[in-house]
Amino acid sequence: MTKPAVQKNGLHPRNRHRDRYDFPTLKHSYPALIPFVTVNAYGDESVDFANPEAVKTLNQALLQHFYQIEHWEIPDGFLCPPIPGRADYIHHLADLLAEDNRAVVPREASVLDIGCGANCIYPLIGYREYGWRFTGSEINPIAMKAANQTIEANPGLNRAIRLRRQKSSTAILAGIIHKNETFDAVMCNPPFHASAEDARQGSQRKLHNLGLDKRSPLNFGGQQDELWCEGGESAFIGQMIKESAGFARQCLWFTSLVSRKENLPEIYRALEAVDAEKVRTIDMAQGQKQSRFVAWSFLDTAARTRWLQKR
């Protein structure tokens, strides 16, 4: 008898990954996954999430099966993102845009992804789900090369996704948004940790949660610019907020993930300091993990509606 699908608590209603992974279907669709699938102590098929190669292959299977991405590779040591959570950001952002567009998610919206990474995951999902056009910024040349290889290896992506190199280590939006250029939304998954030591301790906590020895050579992935920056998440978002004021009429919504809830008061103060017209906090959840993104606009409701009607 086929087991009933068990839904993952809290994921967006349109998220394709609300049910537990259907490994029989994924193995049939993407045979390279077969060697990594085993039966766990509960009698369910799964993969070893402590094995970076297994996690990457699972992502390849999910991208191929759900999003028709036939070729996706990331270099060793780069972040391998959990796709369900990344998809949730896209779907909640779509709802935010729909609020100003008579409850209709705009097609072919123009979106800027700050720090798209080697995985380029937000542009891939956003384009396949909603036909959005993406500009991805990236400071790491190796990551940018890998993302470009994915774009060129999959037919049609190069007409929807373009990448721009961020040449300044201190800028986020500056140098990426061109004069007279507009975006319907800006999205960002900022570096989480405040130092390399914080990042190392975060990896050790993951090892502990997986029941592994701290001396394990496990590589969870993530380059310096992906994992940490001076001052951590709060400082990065604060800089993004300051820069956003200079592009107040070029972007409808600015958004950023906020991993640490305790950073919200400081973020709200920064938004008040730049006179943001509208601020929203969108809560998200995946099982026991709680997350959110903060969105802000310098346009009032009427101006935001006019913006989308003129697209």
From Swiss-Prot:
Signal peptide: none annotated. Its EC number is 2.1.1.181. It is an enzyme of class 2 (transferase). One of its GO terms (cellular component) is cytoplasm. It catalyses: adenosine(1618) in 23S rRNA + S-adenosyl-L-methionine = N(6)-methyladenosine(1618) in 23S rRNA + S-adenosyl-L-homocysteine + H(+). It comes from the Bacteria. Keywords: Cytoplasm, Methyltransferase, rRNA processing, S-adenosyl-L-methionine, Transferase. One of its GO terms (molecular function) is 23S rRNA (adenine(1618)-N(6))-methyltransferase activity. One of its GO terms (biological process) is rRNA base methylation. The keyword rRNA processing applies. Gene3D superfamilies: Vaccinia Virus protein VP39. Specifically methylates the adenine in position 1618 of 23S rRNA. Belongs to the methyltransferase superfamily. METTL16/RlmF family. PANTHER family: RNA N6-ADENOSINE-METHYLTRANSFERASE METTL16 (PTHR13393:SF0), SAM-DEPENDENT METHYLTRANSFERASE (PTHR13393). This is Ribosomal RNA large subunit methyltransferase F. It comes from Pectobacterium carotovorum subsp. carotovorum (strain PC1). The gene is rlmF.
